[in-house]
């Protein structure tokens, strides 16, 4: 079976979005152009930022239709990341809370893509 290893978000400005994600992820993109930016994350996972104005074929929707999910090492890291991102001015959709699967919160990036940070409860980890 194939394994998903690449997510592309359609953004208004790849250069601005790349600066935003570089700040959040603590790493620089490996590729940038006026229409595209690429980050290579842990274990080879890739995050692409493609201009919604030049994506081919053209996309009808952008932002808010899914979530980019980032796992952290423990519940305290969920709260610390929330405090950090709040201090950076990110819009928050959900304050840190405990749900069935773990501790989590949801923020928005500049293009209204949902960013979920979570730490799974032990029973949810399998």
Regions from the PLM with identified roles:
Residues 2, 38-40, 63, 85-86:
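A structural feature recognizing the 12-helix transmembrane core of secondary solute carriers
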């Amino acid at each position: 079976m194939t394994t998903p290893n690449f997510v592309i978000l359609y953004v208004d400005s790849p250069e601005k979005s790349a600066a935003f994600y570089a700040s959040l992820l603590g790493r620089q993109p490996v590729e940038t152009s006026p229409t595209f930016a690429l980050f290579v994350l842990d274990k080879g996972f890739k995050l692409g930022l493609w201009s919604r104005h030049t994506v081919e074929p053209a996309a009808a929707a952008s932002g808010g239709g899914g979530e980019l999910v980032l796992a952290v090492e423990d519940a305290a890291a969920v709260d610390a990341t929330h405090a950090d991102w709040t201090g950076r001015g990110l819009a928050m959709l959900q304050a840190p809370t405990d749900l069935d699967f773990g501790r989590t919160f949801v923020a928005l990036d500049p293009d209204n893509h949902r960013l979920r940070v979570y730490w799974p409860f032990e029973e949810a980890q399998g």
